[in-house]
């Protein structure tokens, strides 16, 4: 198999189902060697099942590609390190890390339990930190040893994290953290030949079933298929994307866009008198753009 990712070794978390599976299959189709990570739990993070990751490995091998399965819980820092080491030990190198694993425990803030908050932050935010921390340390050591590195980190944020969505304070906070993590890690790791980008996907998967997306018309469903998210991730994983880092890409079958992030808006000269702040804020708000809706458009 050959393609734009020929010979590149990719670790993909949460790759047993949904979007992650599409990444694994397309990257393998473009010549990458894949570590298919998946704990195999349900969409709330409960349970374990090795078969989803193993099934994707079998699909890749049937295509003529190379892949191995990994069942690590990415929220476990030590297990995340072992996953990265597995890639290096088995394939002899590591070129790409795709942090995709995730769960949902949606709840209105006033009803959210501490465990629902902790679980989502753990899988999404810590589950991005752990693999990235270990991969980054590996690449840094290669550079210190005189080797040239051309590596990629591809994280997964969400419109809920960069724009907001009701009922997802835990999920949105985790995804907003991942967006910031992406920008900052891009700054820190550029010196080692590592780029860091993220995608904010919109697709119909088992995680979106309770959001009413299953009730969409067939044309819309087709445009929201997970397959549409894989091309940008595959390109970002390739050597062709070398000059792109610190960016968030919003993607569905209908649109590929760059999320422009926070920018300073209108400004005024401040005052040290709190009784004079009201008119200044009113002036600022009159000139400022409104917050975007959950699709990134002005309200």
Identify the residue ranges that each predicted region occupies.
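The beta1-alpha1 cofactor-binding region of Rossmann-like NAD(H)/NADP(H)-dependent oxidoreductases
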Residues: 50, 54, 71-84, 114
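Residue(s) in the substrate-gating loop at a strand-loop-helix junction
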Residues: 158
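A glycine-rich helix->loop->beta "capping" turn
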Residues: 6, 63-66, 86-99, 105, ...
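C-terminal helical subdomain
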Residues: 198, 218-299
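Active-site helix of classical SDR
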Residues: 132, 174
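Canonical Rossmann dinucleotide-binding motif of NAD(H)/NADP(H)-dependent dehydrogenases/reductases
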Residues: 2-36
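Substrate-binding pocket helix/loop in short-chain dehydrogenase/reductase
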Residues: 108-109, 113-121
């Amino acid at each position: 198999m050959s393609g734009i990712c020929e010979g590149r070794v990719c670790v993909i978390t949460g790759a047993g189902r949904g979007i992650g599976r599409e990444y694994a299959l397309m990257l393998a189709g473009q010549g990458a060697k894949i570590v298919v990570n998946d704990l195999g739990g349900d969409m709330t993070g409960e349970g374990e099942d090795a078969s989803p990751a193993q099934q994707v490995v079998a699909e890749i091998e049937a295509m003529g590609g190379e892949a191995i399965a990994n069942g690590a819980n990415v929220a476990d820092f030590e297990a995340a390190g072992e996953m990265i080491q597995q890639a290096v030990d088995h394939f002899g190198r590591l070129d790409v890390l795709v942090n995709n694993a995730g769960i949902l425990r949606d709840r209105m803030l006033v009803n959210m339990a501490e465990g629902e908050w902790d679980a989502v932050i753990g899988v999404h935010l810590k589950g991005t930190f752990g693999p990235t921390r270990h991969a980054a340390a590996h690449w840094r050591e290669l550079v210190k040893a005189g080797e040239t590195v051309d590596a990629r980190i591809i994280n997964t944020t969400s419109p809920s994290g960069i724009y907001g969505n009701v009922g997802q304070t835990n999920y949105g906070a985790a995804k907003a953290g991942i967006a910031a993590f992406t920008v900052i890690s891009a700054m820190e790791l550029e010196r080692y030949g590592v780029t860091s980008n993220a995608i904010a996907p919109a697709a119909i998967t088992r995680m979106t079933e309770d959001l009413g997306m299953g009730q969409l018309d067939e044309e819309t469903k087709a445009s929201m298929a997970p397959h549409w998210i894989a091309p940008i991730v595959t390109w970002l994983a390739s050597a062709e994307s070398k000059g792109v880092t610190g960016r968030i890409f919003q993607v569905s079958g209908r649109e590929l866009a760059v999320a422009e992030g926070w920018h300073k808006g209108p400004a005024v000269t401040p005052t040290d008198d709190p009784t004079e702040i009201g008119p200044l804020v009113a002036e600022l708000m009159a000139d400022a753009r409104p917050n975007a809706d959950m699709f990134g458009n002005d309200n």
